[in-house]
Swiss-Prot record:
The gene is lepA. It is an enzyme of class 3 (hydrolase). It is found in: Cell inner membrane. GTP binds at D14, H15, G16, K17, S18, T19, N131, K132, I133, D134. It is a peripheral membrane protein. It comes from the Bacteria. This is Elongation factor 4. GO terms for cellular component: plasma membrane. It holds the Pfam family LepA_C. Belongs to the TRAFAC class translation factor GTPase superfamily. Classic translation factor GTPase family. LepA subfamily. InterPro entries: EF-4 (IPR006297), EFG_III/V (IPR035647), EFG_V-like (IPR000640), EFTu-like_2 (IPR004161), G_TR_CS (IPR031157), LepA_C_sf (IPR038363), LepA_CTD (IPR013842), LepA_IV (IPR035654). Keywords: Cell inner membrane, Cell membrane, GTP-binding, Hydrolase, Membrane, Nucleotide-binding, Protein biosynthesis. Required for accurate and efficient protein synthesis under certain stress conditions. May act as a fidelity factor of the translation reaction, by catalyzing a one-codon backward translocation of tRNAs on improperly translocated ribosomes. Back-translocation proceeds from a post-translocation (POST) complex to a pre-translocation (PRE) complex, thus giving elongation factor G a second chance to translocate the tRNAs correctly. Binds to ribosomes in a GTP-dependent manner.
């Protein structure tokens, strides 16, 4: 066990984490030259295209160090985006050390700081590595100082490397061997294995990635999942090199996969503990929290025939994604669908893209909302993640909205514009520190403002250099109202939203103007209104199409013309009473995209 090293890499998007892992695999001969491709571990197409890591992956490599000994390196790749911080905390729970990879040209970013603190809280040895030193703009000394000032880790003499051209990769491996502690644990104790990740394979069923804390698990043995108490038999186990390599057993300190023919998605929940069926351990591996969705949205298929496929697709995805929540929902405008809970906006976009791409579904997503608390006059507290759960306005004493503490790191040239957008989003400044070239700004912001389009706005005003990390800190009372959209007097449930009273008129006007352009003209007038309770705050009218009924009259008597015009008027009136307005899908999509 003294020659095992379990570590993961903490890095911001684009700081070269996946490239560095490619180099590790190359140096340790994990794959042949023919099988090597860029970003080996980012196995989903969408991960490659966006250049981000979403799922945690693992690789076991044998490295012969300069001291002549062979070490088993278990490397768990982690995502860098704030939405996937739960994947990060899970991966870190299986390690003893973490490499903090920082781009020597760009410096420290907010999400790196957050993940780094998670690692320090879990008592991991954090080792700073400066990557991309081949770039002409690299300033390793300045960045090392930034790491010390912002994160508080000693970065003097930090290992430098360039993963892209392969300089210094062996130095990084030597640093891992020297500084990451060997795992603790007893091979002869009762089995305790932590499930880091589970995914569904069409041929094998559920494949679980586990870190054995104590004991040994062998092929053919029976084990049970502690939270459910159900027992299974091990069909296959082994490690990823990154290909699947079968072994006879996994012992304490090792990381590998287990296949036990589990068919049910929830049979091996992520974060659970496995133990022997006949000689179980008493306590599960600690340090695991259930993740709560932060953003909710309704998802509907464009054609109702796809509903069963949609349900199956969500069930399969939720196996690979412990943080996805969904329940059935019915909307008058959009039909049957699901109310889904996500960690954040990127998570929502990625789930939608995976559903559309991997399962060929056409989806509409309703406007994202967060969880509000409605306190009724009788003292009852209702958690509102869906507008249909909101009580009548007369019964509500107050509505509380979630507030997040946002840490924003930006180059000092952009401070003014960042403060401006924070104020526009109803933010309250908590702190502002200058650290070298960077400025760390802390704001308390309403969560709904952060999840709608704050990240995009931040990126555009800081030319892409701003980075953001946020966490929910409290709920506080706010003057929120429900903004309904009426078309010819009928409410359209899919377009309703909860907004702050100060912004309601502006939002309502913007919404009706946008709908006016999107709803095609009918044979009768269409009134589009935005309302708060019984008060109309904005209105716009789609004018009627008009057929020229006088065309066949030529000269003719004026009373004859009047009669025809009156008849047309009557018809339009009747049509308006009974005609229903077809709202095209594009109208929903473009309104909800905002």
């Amino acid at each position: 066990m003294k020659n095992i090293r379990n570590f993961s890499i903490i890095a911001h998007i684009d700081h070269g984490k996946s490239t560095l892992s490619d180099r590790f695999i190359q140096v340790c001969n994990g794959l042949s030259e023919r099988e090597m491709k860029e970003q080996v571990l980012d196995s989903m197409d969408i991960e490659r295209e966006r250049g981000i890591t979403i799922k945690a992956q693992s690789v076991t490599l044998d490295y012969t160090a300069r001291d002549g000994q062979t070490y088993q390196l278990n490397f768990i790749d982690t995502p860098g985006h704030v939405d996937f911080s739960y994947e990060v905390s899970r991966s870190l729970a299986a390690c003893e050390g973490a490499l903090l990879v920082v781009d020597a040209a760009q410096g420290v970013e907010a999400q790196t700081v957050a993940n780094c603190y998670t690692a320090i809280e879990q008592n991991l040895e954090v080792i700073p590595i400066l990557n991309k030193i081949d770039l002409p703009s690299a300033e390793p000394d300045r960045v090392a100082q930034e790491i010390e000032e912002i994160i508080g880790i000693d970065a003097t003499g930090a290992t430098t490397c360039s993963a892209k051209i392969g300089i210094g990769v062996e130095d990084v491996l030597e640093t891992i061997v020297a500084k990451v502690p060997a795992p603790e644990g007893d091979v002869n104790a009762k089995l305790q294995a932590l499930i880091i990740d589970s995914w569904f394979d069409n041929y094998l069923g559920v494949v679980s990635l586990v870190r054995v804390k104590n004991g040994t698990i062998k092929k053919g043995e029976k084990f049970k999942v502690m939270s459910t108490g159900v027992a299974y038999q091990v069909d296959r186990l082994g490690v990823f090199t990154p290909k699947m390599k079968d072994l006879d057993h996994l012992k304490a300190g090792e990381v590998g996969f287990i296949v036990a023919g589990i068919k049910d998605i929830h049979g091996a929940p992520v974060g659970d503990t496995l133990t022997h069926a006949h000689n179980p351990t008493d306590k599960p591996v600690p340090g695991f929290k259930k993740v709560q969705p932060q953003v909710y949205a309704g998802m509907f298929t464009i054609s109702s025939d796809d509903y069963p496929d949609f349900r199956e697709a969500l069930e399969k995805l939720s196996l690979n994604d412990a943080s996805l929540f969904f329940e059935p929902e019915v909307s008058q405008a959009l039909g049957f669908g699901f109310r889904c809970g996500f960690l954040g906006m990127l998570h929502m976009e990625i789930i939608q893209e995976r559903l559309e791409r991997e399962y060929n579904l056409d989806l509409i997503t309703s406007a994202p909302t967060v969880v509000y608390k409605a306190i009724k006059k009788d003292g009852e507290i209702i958690e509102v993640d869906n507008l249909s759960k909101l009580p009548e306005p007369g019964a509500i004493a107050e509505i509380q909205e979630p507030i997040v503490r946002a840490n924003i790191l930006v180059p000092k040239d952009y401070v003014g514009s960042v403060i401006t957008i924070c104020i526009e989003k109803r933010g309250v400044q908590v702190d502002l520190n200058y650290v070298g070239n960077q400025v760390s700004i802390t704001y308390d912001l309403p969560m709904i403002e952060v999840v709608s389009d704050f990240f995009d706005t931040l990126k555009s005003v800081t030319k892409g250099y701003g980075s953001l990390d946020y966490e929910l800190i409290r709920y506080e009372p706010a003057n929120m109202v429900c903004l309904d959209v009426l078309i010819n007097g009928d409410k359209v449930d899919a377009l309703a939203s909860i907004v702050h009273k100060d912004q309601a008129k502006y939002k309502g006007r913007e919404l009706v103007e946008r709908l006016k352009e999107l709803i095609p003209r009918q044979m009768f007038e269409v009134a589009i209104q935005a309302a708060i309770g019984g008060t109309i705050v904005a209105r716009s009218t789609v004018k009627a199409l008009r057929k020229n009924v006088l065309a066949k009259c030529y000269g003719g008597d004026v009373s004859r013309k009047k009669k025809l015009l009156e008849k047309q008027k009557e018809g339009k009136k009747r049509m308006k009473n009974i005609g229903s307005v077809e709202i095209p899908q594009e109208a929903f999509l473009s309104v909800l995209k905002k």
